[in-house]
Amino acid sequence: MTSRNYLLLTPGPLTTSRTVKEAMLFDSCTWDDDYNIGVVEQIRQQLTALATASEGYTSVLLQGSGSYAVEAVLGSALGPQDKVLIVSNGAYGARMVEMSGLMGIAHHAYDCGEVARPDVQAIDAILNADPTISHIAMVHSETTTGMLNPIDEVGALAHRYGKTYIVDAMSSFGGIPMDIATLHIDYLISSANKCIQGVPGFAFVIAREQKLAACKGRSRSLSLDLYAQWRCMEDNHGKWRFTSPTHTVLAFAQALKELAKEGGVAARHQRYQQNQRSLVAGMRALGFNTLLDDELHSPIITAFYSPEDPQYRFSEFYRRLKEQGFVIYPGKVSQSDCFRIGNIGEVYAADITALLTAIRTAMYWMK
C-alpha cells in the first residue's frame, strides 16, 4: 500500500478533485432530511435536468457499480413476453447479452465486431424481420475500444418501430452533450465515477416516468428492483431502500457543483475532446498507432496497438509509467494486442503533455 497519488488515465474510477475527496469527510444519517431531501433529492433533480429539459422523466440512484444498474434495468424493464435486441461491439454490450441469458430474458444479440461501428441498416433489417422485439439496448461509449456508437440513429429507429430504448451511457453522460428526449431514450444508465467525476459507489438511471411506472412486479431480483427503488425514493423523499453509500453521494453532490462551475457538459466535453486529440497526436509522434480510425473515437478513452518490438511487455511499460506517477489501462480487445489511455477526470492539457514526456521516458524497448 502506498500513499502516493497517481494520475489515473482510465475510464473510471478516475482522478478526482481534492474538494470531491474532502466532501467525503462528513458522516450522514440515512434517515435525516438534511441528507435525503437536501442532498439525494437535489441530485435526482440535477441529473434529470442534465439529461433533458423535457417533462416526464425521473431519476433513480442505485447502490453498486454501473453494471448493477444495467442489470436492474434489463431485469425490471422487460416483462416475460418481451424481447430485447442488444447491439454489441465490445465487452459491455457482451455483458448485457450475458445478463439477459442469466435472467432468462429473450434477446437477439447483434454482434458487429469489436472494431466495427454498428450498421444501422442491419439493425433496421433485424427489427423489420422480428416484430417480437420490444426493446433495444446498446452502449454509447464502448470503452473496450474507445468507440462512440450512433445512439442518435438507433434512437430514430427505436422511435419509428415503437421500441423501448435502453442506453448504457456509463462513460459518456456528463462528458458528451445529449438530450435523451430528442434521442428517444427511455432508460439512460450511468455511474457516479465516470464523466461527472465522482467516486465509485452508486449508479443511476434516468428514465421516462411512464415506462418506469409500468415496471411494477417485473423485477427478477429483490435488491435490483428498479421500480421499487424509484417508488421508495419518490414516496420517502430521497430515502434509499437499503443502506445508502452516504460518502459517495456527498462526493457526487460536490462533483455536480464542479461540473456546473466548469461550464456544464459542453465545456467538459470540449476539455475531454482536446485532451484526446492532443494525446493521439503525441502518441503518433512517438510511433504508436490507434486501434480505431479517428472518426470512430470517443473523447473518453483511446486504444493503442502495442509495439511489435519483442522486448516490449505491457507490465514493464506500466511499471515505468507508474513510477513517474501515471496509471494507464491494459487492453480488452480480444483480437488485437492493445493498451488503453483514458483522458477524463481531473485531467488537463498540462497533464497530457506530462504524460507524453513520461511515455517517452518509459519506452525502454527503444533504448
UniProtKB/Swiss-Prot annotation:
One of its GO terms (biological process) is organic phosphonate catabolic process. Its cofactor is pyridoxal 5'-phosphate. GO terms for molecular function: 2-aminoethylphosphonate-pyruvate transaminase activity. The keyword Chloroplast does not apply. Gene3D superfamilies: Aspartate Aminotransferase, domain 1, Type I PLP-dependent aspartate aminotransferase-like (Major domain). Its EC number is 2.6.1.37. The keyword NADP does not apply. InterPro entries: Aminotrans_V_dom, NH2EtPonate_pyrv_transaminase, PyrdxlP-dep_Trfase, PyrdxlP-dep_Trfase_major, PyrdxlP-dep_Trfase_small, SP_NH2Trfase/AEP_transaminase. It catalyses: (2-aminoethyl)phosphonate + pyruvate = phosphonoacetaldehyde + L-alanine. It is an enzyme of class 2 (transferase). Keywords: Aminotransferase, Pyridoxal phosphate, Pyruvate, Transferase. The modification N6-(pyridoxal phosphate)lysine is found at K194. Belongs to the class-V pyridoxal-phosphate-dependent aminotransferase family. PhnW subfamily. Involved in phosphonate degradation. Homodimer. This is 2-aminoethylphosphonate--pyruvate transaminase. It comes from Salmonella agona (strain SL483).
